[in-house]
Amino acid sequence: MSRYRGPRLKKIRRLGALPGLTRKTPKSGSNLKKKFHSGKKEQYRIRLQEKQKLRFHYGLTERQLLRYVHIAGKAKRSTGQVLLQLLEMRLDNILFRLGMASTIPGARQLVNHRHILVNGRIVNIPSFRCKPRDIITTKDNQRSKGLVQTLMASSDPGKLPKHLTIDTLEYKGLVNKILDRKWVGLKINELLVVEY
Protein backbone atom coordinates (compact mmCIF):
# COMPACT_ATOMS: atom_id res chain seq x y z
CA MET A 1 0.00 0.00 0.00
CA SER A 2 1.18 3.50 -0.69
CA ARG A 3 0.98 6.53 1.57
CA TYR A 4 -2.55 7.87 2.10
CA ARG A 5 -3.21 11.15 0.28
CA GLY A 6 -7.01 11.27 0.38
CA PRO A 7 -9.44 13.26 2.52
CA ARG A 8 -8.14 13.48 6.07
CA LEU A 9 -11.39 14.33 7.84
CA LYS A 10 -12.91 11.02 6.74
CA LYS A 11 -10.13 9.21 8.56
CA ILE A 12 -10.56 11.37 11.66
CA ARG A 13 -14.31 10.71 11.76
CA ARG A 14 -13.70 6.98 11.55
CA LEU A 15 -10.65 6.60 13.82
CA GLY A 16 -10.88 9.55 16.22
CA ALA A 17 -8.44 12.41 16.83
CA LEU A 18 -5.15 12.11 14.93
CA PRO A 19 -3.16 15.27 15.74
CA GLY A 20 -0.26 14.29 13.48
CA LEU A 21 -2.45 13.97 10.39
CA THR A 22 -4.25 17.34 10.48
CA ARG A 23 -5.22 20.17 12.80
CA LYS A 24 -8.83 20.06 11.62
CA THR A 25 -11.55 18.56 13.76
CA PRO A 26 -14.93 17.27 12.58
CA LYS A 27 -18.08 19.18 13.50
CA SER A 28 -19.70 17.91 16.66
CA GLY A 29 -22.99 16.88 15.00
CA SER A 30 -21.54 15.60 11.73
CA ASN A 31 -21.19 11.98 12.80
CA LEU A 32 -24.82 11.40 13.77
CA LYS A 33 -25.60 8.84 11.08
CA LYS A 34 -27.67 6.01 12.43
CA LYS A 35 -25.66 2.83 12.46
CA PHE A 36 -27.66 -0.33 12.32
CA HIS A 37 -24.96 -2.78 13.30
CA SER A 38 -24.73 -4.19 16.75
CA GLY A 39 -22.80 -2.33 19.42
CA LYS A 40 -20.37 -5.21 19.82
CA LYS A 41 -17.15 -4.86 17.84
CA GLU A 42 -15.24 -7.88 16.67
CA GLN A 43 -11.70 -8.31 17.97
CA TYR A 44 -10.28 -8.19 14.46
CA ARG A 45 -11.98 -4.85 13.80
CA ILE A 46 -10.67 -3.34 17.06
CA ARG A 47 -7.09 -4.42 16.28
CA LEU A 48 -7.35 -3.16 12.71
CA GLN A 49 -8.58 0.25 13.87
CA GLU A 50 -5.70 0.58 16.34
CA LYS A 51 -3.23 -0.31 13.60
CA GLN A 52 -4.81 2.18 11.20
CA LYS A 53 -4.66 4.92 13.86
CA LEU A 54 -0.94 4.34 14.18
CA ARG A 55 -0.42 4.25 10.42
CA PHE A 56 -2.36 7.40 9.61
CA HIS A 57 -1.05 9.39 12.58
CA TYR A 58 2.61 8.78 11.74
CA GLY A 59 2.10 8.69 7.95
CA LEU A 60 3.51 5.20 7.47
CA THR A 61 3.00 2.62 4.77
CA GLU A 62 2.00 -0.91 5.71
CA ARG A 63 5.50 -2.18 4.98
CA GLN A 64 7.16 0.48 7.14
CA LEU A 65 4.88 -0.34 10.06
CA LEU A 66 5.62 -4.06 9.72
CA ARG A 67 9.34 -3.31 9.70
CA TYR A 68 9.02 -1.27 12.91
CA VAL A 69 6.97 -4.05 14.58
CA HIS A 70 9.64 -6.57 13.57
CA ILE A 71 12.43 -4.41 15.05
CA ALA A 72 10.41 -3.84 18.24
CA GLY A 73 9.76 -7.59 18.53
CA LYS A 74 13.49 -8.28 18.72
CA ALA A 75 13.91 -5.93 21.69
CA LYS A 76 14.02 -7.36 25.19
CA ARG A 77 11.57 -4.80 26.60
CA SER A 78 7.84 -4.48 25.98
CA THR A 79 7.25 -4.69 22.24
CA GLY A 80 4.46 -2.12 22.22
CA GLN A 81 6.46 0.45 24.14
CA VAL A 82 9.55 -0.03 21.96
CA LEU A 83 7.36 0.35 18.86
CA LEU A 84 6.03 3.70 20.07
CA GLN A 85 9.54 4.86 20.97
CA LEU A 86 10.82 3.97 17.50
CA LEU A 87 7.98 5.90 15.87
CA GLU A 88 8.33 8.91 18.17
CA MET A 89 12.08 9.19 17.51
CA ARG A 90 11.60 9.60 13.75
CA LEU A 91 12.84 12.98 12.48
CA ASP A 92 9.50 14.01 10.96
CA ASN A 93 7.69 13.31 14.24
CA ILE A 94 10.27 15.19 16.31
CA LEU A 95 9.89 18.25 14.06
CA PHE A 96 6.12 18.04 14.60
CA ARG A 97 6.57 17.73 18.38
CA LEU A 98 8.99 20.68 18.47
CA GLY A 99 6.42 22.86 16.72
CA MET A 100 8.53 23.38 13.60
CA ALA A 101 5.71 21.89 11.49
CA SER A 102 1.94 21.93 11.95
CA THR A 103 1.47 18.28 10.95
CA ILE A 104 3.67 15.24 10.36
CA PRO A 105 3.13 15.43 6.56
CA GLY A 106 4.26 19.08 6.77
CA ALA A 107 7.36 17.97 8.66
CA ARG A 108 8.04 15.32 6.00
CA GLN A 109 7.95 18.04 3.36
CA LEU A 110 10.42 20.21 5.30
CA VAL A 111 12.81 17.28 5.54
CA ASN A 112 12.38 16.22 1.89
CA HIS A 113 13.07 19.78 0.69
CA ARG A 114 16.36 19.78 2.63
CA HIS A 115 15.53 22.57 5.09
CA ILE A 116 16.55 20.59 8.20
CA LEU A 117 19.99 19.85 9.66
CA VAL A 118 20.73 17.17 12.26
CA ASN A 119 24.03 17.71 14.06
CA GLY A 120 25.11 20.15 11.33
CA ARG A 121 24.39 17.82 8.39
CA ILE A 122 21.51 18.03 5.94
CA VAL A 123 19.12 15.11 6.36
CA ASN A 124 16.47 14.53 3.70
CA ILE A 125 15.08 11.25 5.04
CA PRO A 126 11.91 11.73 7.14
CA SER A 127 12.29 8.31 8.79
CA PHE A 128 15.78 9.20 10.09
CA ARG A 129 16.00 7.83 13.63
CA CYS A 130 17.10 10.54 16.07
CA LYS A 131 19.12 9.66 19.13
CA PRO A 132 19.53 11.43 22.48
CA ARG A 133 21.74 14.55 22.27
CA ASP A 134 20.90 15.15 18.59
CA ILE A 135 20.62 18.84 17.68
CA ILE A 136 17.99 19.67 15.06
CA THR A 137 18.20 23.06 13.32
CA THR A 138 17.11 24.76 10.12
CA LYS A 139 19.43 25.84 7.35
CA ASP A 140 20.99 29.28 7.74
CA ASN A 141 19.25 30.74 4.69
CA GLN A 142 16.30 33.09 5.11
CA ARG A 143 13.81 30.86 3.28
CA SER A 144 14.28 27.90 5.61
CA LYS A 145 14.07 30.05 8.72
CA GLY A 146 10.97 31.82 7.38
CA LEU A 147 9.12 28.53 6.91
CA VAL A 148 9.72 27.48 10.50
CA GLN A 149 9.45 30.93 12.12
CA THR A 150 5.69 31.39 11.74
CA LEU A 151 4.91 27.88 12.97
CA MET A 152 7.16 28.14 16.01
CA ALA A 153 5.63 31.49 16.97
CA SER A 154 2.13 30.00 16.98
CA SER A 155 3.03 26.76 18.80
CA ASP A 156 2.44 26.35 22.52
CA PRO A 157 5.66 25.70 24.50
CA GLY A 158 3.61 24.09 27.28
CA LYS A 159 2.76 21.17 24.98
CA LEU A 160 6.43 20.33 24.40
CA PRO A 161 7.22 16.80 25.66
CA LYS A 162 9.85 16.41 28.38
CA HIS A 163 12.26 14.53 26.12
CA LEU A 164 12.70 17.59 23.85
CA THR A 165 13.93 21.14 24.41
CA ILE A 166 13.68 24.05 21.98
CA ASP A 167 15.45 27.36 21.48
CA THR A 168 12.99 29.57 19.59
CA LEU A 169 15.51 32.34 18.91
CA GLU A 170 17.98 30.11 17.08
CA TYR A 171 15.33 27.72 15.64
CA LYS A 172 17.09 24.82 17.32
CA GLY A 173 15.73 21.72 19.01
CA LEU A 174 17.49 19.16 21.17
CA VAL A 175 16.56 15.54 21.84
CA ASN A 176 17.29 14.98 25.55
CA LYS A 177 16.31 11.33 25.95
CA ILE A 178 14.08 8.60 24.59
CA LEU A 179 10.37 9.28 25.04
CA ASP A 180 8.25 7.97 27.93
CA ARG A 181 4.91 6.34 27.10
CA LYS A 182 2.85 9.04 28.85
CA TRP A 183 4.03 11.77 26.44
CA VAL A 184 2.71 10.05 23.31
CA GLY A 185 0.03 12.40 21.98
CA LEU A 186 -2.19 9.63 20.63
CA LYS A 187 -4.84 7.59 22.45
CA ILE A 188 -3.89 4.10 21.38
CA ASN A 189 -3.45 0.61 22.77
CA GLU A 190 -0.12 -0.38 21.21
CA LEU A 191 -0.43 -4.02 22.31
CA LEU A 192 -3.38 -4.49 19.95
CA VAL A 193 -1.19 -3.24 17.08
CA VAL A 194 1.49 -5.78 17.94
CA GLU A 195 -1.11 -8.57 18.18
CA TYR A 196 -2.56 -7.66 14.79
UniProtKB/Swiss-Prot annotation:
HAMAP family: Ribosomal_uS4_B. This is Small ribosomal subunit protein uS4c. PROSITE patterns: RIBOSOMAL_S4, S4. NCBIfam families: PRK05327.1, rpsD_bact. Part of the 30S ribosomal subunit. Contacts protein S5. The interaction surface between S4 and S5 is involved in control of translational fidelity. Residues 17-36 are annotated as: Disordered. It comes from Festuca gigantea. Its main location: plastid. GO terms for cellular component: chloroplast; small ribosomal subunit. The gene is rps4. One of its GO terms (molecular function) is structural constituent of ribosome. InterPro entries: Ribosomal_uS4, Ribosomal_uS4_bac-type, Ribosomal_uS4_CS, Ribosomal_uS4_N, S4_RNA-bd, S4_RNA-bd_sf. It comes from the Eukaryota. GO terms for biological process: ribosomal small subunit biogenesis; translation. Disulfide bonds: none annotated. Keywords: Chloroplast, Plastid, Ribonucleoprotein, Ribosomal protein, RNA-binding, rRNA-binding. One of the primary rRNA binding proteins, it binds directly to 16S rRNA where it nucleates assembly of the body of the 30S subunit. It is found in: Plastid, Chloroplast. Belongs to the universal ribosomal protein uS4 family. Residues 89-169 form the S4 RNA-binding domain.
